[in-house]
A protein has these predicted regions:
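Short beta-strand->alpha-helix linker/helix-N-cap micro-motif
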Residues: 31-107, 115-132, 158-169
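Beta-propeller domains
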Residues: 597-678
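Exposed, low-structure sequence patches enriched in small/polar residues
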Residues: 572, 660-949
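Mid-sequence helix-capping/hinge segment at a functional interface
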Residues: 32-37, 44, 139-186
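Short loop/turn motifs that connect adjacent beta-strands in outer-membrane beta-barrel proteins
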Residues: 381-387, 432-440, 474, 479, ...
């Protein structure tokens, strides 16, 4: 059985509003005074209409009358009357009325408390139960009404002092497997009272809940609280929005611009609804657009693609723990493309997280519609049936470069990153989530294929192989999840996109394997919120963990690609487990994985352990600790460990402080094994400043992490001035930035890197961007460096400068991408570079081509060389759940041409079929006879099936 009750207390503000709105026509007869300690109870209405059930209404009213009289609330009289008018004649301020409905042997009773002085419903409760337990059900109605009246009557007990007994959950009918595109979903029996008040469990960071039928309430600061509506009918997920709920429940329509005109109304209307039933959260929206469909930016259906992020789209994020830091996001465009992301610490979105959910879209004369269905079992939340969540709704109108929110974040995080400012989200109340589900998921897989490896010893050709394994997910509690994997296989994962590396440091590649993606943000170390815009006029030189604005030099203490991969060779994962979630104010994560041996990579069987705990403090800050262990070190006999403690603080809208202290234990390296960092960020819209000090000692070696460079002490500062000129209609914002990076050896103190940058850029109103920067470098090579074939630079100091110009084509254009031209010095020589990166050309709504080209000509006194990187991706999306992707890459640095062809079909939510072909060829023979020599290739078919219990 479920139970819901709402409380709305009268206060001085409400009383004043009532007094001001009472009609006071001259000569009108004065209404009789209503006593605040008198209650009238009227018979409850029989919604079901069955004559046999007619006696129930009088029985409920009689029990309520008697129960309230002996409740202990300071009431002078509780009288049963025939109707509300009779109660008013008795001078009763409060009238209790209601209804009941019967479905089989189940009974639902809804009771409302109305203030006769205003006619407003100020509280409501709903109780479900079996007809056989009718007397106990009546007692629970009384127990639920007592705290409502206690909060209204002077001298009464507080509304939180009395709670009705928790009901039992009724048996739920088994859900059918997904069928055709339009799928009905079960809903609860029709509710009688659309104006049910909301009960909340917790403190709301915003205005009070809206009083039904209103669904949104704003305060003077613009903060919003939204009320979710329980469905009273079956909802068919078809994107048409033709159910009666969309006509009877008010829409959330007062969206607000964040960009380009902060605080202004949107230029196009958006209506949204937040609905739920016993199994799912539903988000529906009607997206009005005065332009014809041919002008909409809707040209991608592939799940989680970068282009989908740039289309006209509609987003919802839910902060299910209401911690104002972490959330999950779901979005779609007019074509029904699906996108989702897990947001950690107000930034760092993980768009490779793929929960089970569904979406359908439609079109109407004047716009498009979207319906999302998000199962509660795909979410993690605090225990208890009544919830307070954070919620944000956003619409992106790409052709106008316009972003509108239901609760807009500060403009300093304008553009796409604004959706990740979780603390700016509205509050969601009124949800009733299922209780008691163990939430067990079992996902077995089978795989088979052929492989050829001519680089192996001995070479192999067309070797057949097959395998099977299983992943299991178990909800320990509603907010703590255990994952187990056995015989894990990642053959379906797309290959990495190659990068040009003209530095002497390692490249960083993101994790793409599904098992390591869910809950990955919990293991992030010393990563603060995204305070400002993603965009910068400065060149992001290098890669790796840490803040990209700071150059990516901070170590990543846990880097999951160290598990199951070694020197480019796949190492088999025998099995393992992970526990992630939230316990009170603590984020917790524990990971243990066991890998097999791999002779080709020289790796023995190894066990990996990672433990993470993080404590939320203040409003948006945290303290944490991380531990990693590798049972077999790569650098000596024995195990290696890393320990770290970190703190992230966020103040006001745009101030952040981050710090950490970490230590590693590596065989044979007992000293000089510390790393620590302190960083300050101020990121307002018009100005920005960052200062950082980072130390990585010589023997600090996180063997389950990532380290771009070692043995250094770094001091880094940057400043930004970014005005928005009102006198230039074509310019949205200028950015003038400068930075200074000073790196010296941690042990000797000698200078190794000194870099100064100055950059200027402009964002145009049509979303194009143009930029120009100048870089002055000093590098001291402590060992010889070979940037290209036949060229080895000797030890010594080098000073060199270069300039770079960029132009990024905006989202409104058919062809998008960034053109880059660079010229200047390179160590003791010269460099000329040209590139066209992240380009995309849609041929149709389903077919697109994504080319990227990077060409570099380098000439030094020791010789000249050229590096070419050409990447071409072809995408064909059959439906939002089935797509083909072909990726071809030519990299002259390692003389290879590689191909990766993938077909992915999600034939049922969470269940997939993959067909993958990969190939790598030697390109040295390419020049004389236009042929290539095969290195390796593979063909696999993998199928998995998700079972949810």
């Amino acid at each position: 059985m479920t139970e819901r009750r709402g409380v709305r207390g009268s206060d001085a503000v409400l009383l004043l509003a009532v007094l001001l709105t009472v009609p006071a026509a001259v000569g009108a007869q004065e209404a009789p005074a209503l006593a605040t300690d008198r209650v009238a109870v009227v018979p409850f209405d029989n919604i079901s209409g069955s004559v046999d059930d007619g006696w129930l209404g009088a029985g409920i009213a009689e029990t309520v009358t008697a129960g309230l009289s002996g409740s202990g609330v300071a009431l002078r009289s509780v009288t049963r009357v025939l109707d509300a008018a009779a109660g008013e004649q008795l001078g009763a301020r409060w009238v209790v009325s209601g209804s009941y409905q019967r479905l089989g042997d189940q009974l639902r009773v809804t009771a409302r408390v109305r203030d006769e002085s205003t006619g407003m419903v100020v509280g409501a409760v709903t109780v479900d139960g079996a007809l056989a337990g009718f007397f106990a059900l009546q007692d629970r109605v009384v127990a639920a009404l007592v705290p409502v009246l206690a909060g209204l009557v002077p001298g009464g007990r507080g509304p939180d002092e009395v709670r009705a007994p928790a009901p039992e959950a009724p048996a739920r009918a088994a859900r059918e497997q997904r069928g055709p595109p339009a799928r009905p979903r079960p809903a609860t029996p029709p509710a009688a009272a659309p104006e049910r008040a909301v009960r909340t469990a917790g403190v709301i960071d915003g205005p009070p809940p809206p009083v039904a039928p209103a669904v949104i309430n704003r305060d003077a600061e613009g903060r919003a609280t939204i009320r979710a509506t329980r469905l009273t009918e079956v909802l068919t997920l078809d994107g048409q929005l033709d159910e009666s709920v969309y006509a009877t429940v008010p829409a959330i329509s007062d969206f607000i611009q964040q960009m380009p005109d902060p605080g202004a109304p949107p230029t196009e209307k958006t209506d949204a609804w937040i609905l739920f039933d016993e199994a799912n959260l539903y988000v529906g929206a009607r997206i009005w657009d005065s332009a014809p469909p041919s002008e909409w930016i809707a040209n991608e259906m592939r799940r989680d693609s970068e282009q989908l992020f740039r289309n006209d789209n509609f987003w919802v994020i839910v902060d299910t723990f209401y911690d104002r830091r972490n959330a999950v996001a779901f979005f779609s465009n007019a074509l029904g493309g699906m996108g989702d992301a897990a947001i950690t610490n107000e930034g760092n979105p993980n768009r490779d997280w793929n929960p089970v959910w569904d979406v359908r879209t439609g079109r109407f004369e004047g716009g498009w519609t979207v319906e999302m269905e998000i199962p509660f079992r795909s979410l993690r939340y605090r225990p208890g049936p009544d919830q307070i969540w954070g919620i944000q709704l956003r619409r992106n109108l790409a052709r106008k470069n316009e972003w509108v929110f239901v609760s807009p974040p500060p403009i300093s995080v304008g553009g796409g990153g604004g959706i990740f400012r979780v603390s700016a989200a509205a509050t969601l109340v009124g949800l009733e989530v299922p209780e008691g589900s163990k939430n067990l998921e079992i996902k077995p897989y089978g795989i088979g294929g052929l492989s050829t490896n001519l680089a192996a010893t001995p070479p192999t050709r067309n070797v057949g192989d097959g395998n099977a394994g299983v992943d299991v997910k178990y909800g320990i509690t509603q907010n703590l999840t255990a994952d187990f994997t056995y015989n894990t296989d990642f053959a379906q994962v797309e290959v990495d996109e190659q990068q040009v590396n003209l530095t002497r440091f390692s490249l960083f590649f993101p994790e793409k394997r599904e098992f390591f993606l869910e809950g990955a943000g919990i293991f992030d170390f010393a990563r603060g919120a995204q305070l400002g815009s993603f965009y910068t006029a400065l060149r992001r030189i290098g890669a790796g963990g840490g803040n990209p604005m700071g150059g990516g030099n901070a170590p990543t203490l846990f880097y999951s690609r160290q598990i199951g991969l070694q020197r480019g060779t796949v190492v088999p994962i025998v099995g393992g487990g992970r526990v992630t979630g939230k316990v009170g104010d603590f984020d917790v994560g524990f990971l243990n994985i066991h890998t097999g041996d791999e002779a080709a990579a020289g790796v023995a069987m190894t066990n990996f352990t990672v433990a993470r705990v993080k404590r939320d403090i203040l409003r948006r800050s945290s303290l944490g600790a991380l531990f990693t262990n590798r049972s077999v070190s790569l650098l000596g006999d024995g195990a290696s460990q890393a320990y770290g403690a970190d703190a992230t603080f966020a103040f006001f809208e745009n101030v952040g402080v981050i710090g950490y202290l970490a230590k590693t234990d590596t065989p044979g390296r007992a000293d000089k094994n510390l790393s620590y960092q302190g960083r300050f960020d101020y990121a307002a819209d018009r100005y920005g400043v960052q200062a950082e000090h980072l130390v990585v000692e010589d023997h600090f070696i996180p063997e389950v992490g990532f380290l771009r460079r070692d043995n250094f002490r770094r001091t880094y500062t940057t400043g930004r001035f970014s005005p928005r000129p009102r006198s230039l209609d074509s310019i949205r914002q200028f950015r003038l930035e400068g930075s200074f990076d000073y790196i010296e050896a941690a042990d000797t103190g000698s200078v190794e890197t000194r870099q100064s940058q100055v950059g200027v850029s402009a964002e145009l109103e049509n979303s194009d961007r143009v930029g120009f920067n100048v870089v002055d470098n000093y590098e001291f090579l402590v060992r010889p460096f070979t940037p290209g074939p036949g060229v080895t630079l000797p030890v010594g100091g080098y000073r060199f400068q270069d300039v770079e110009a960029t132009y990024s084509l905006g989202l409104q254009r058919r062809l998008t991408g960034t053109v880059t031209v660079r010229a200047g010095e390179y160590f003791n020589g010269t460099i000329r570079s040209v590139g066209f990166m992240r380009a995309r050309l849609p041929i149709t709504e389903q077919f697109s081509v994504e080319p990227s080209v990077s060409l570099n000509w380098i000439d030094t006194p020791l010789g000249a060389f050229r590096t070419d990187l050409v990447v071409a991706r072809v995408n064909y999306t059959f439906t939002p759940r089935m797509f083909f992707s072909g990726l071809t890459q030519y990299n002259s640095a390692n003389s290879t041409v590689s191909n990766n062809l993938r077909l992915r079909w999600e034939y049922s939510p969470g269940s997939e079929l993959f067909v993958v072909y990969t190939e790598a060829r030697e390109t040295d023979p390419l020049m004389p006879d236009r042929s290539t020599e095969l290195r390796n290739r593979g063909f696999v078919v993998k199928v998995n099936r998700l079972f949810r219990f």
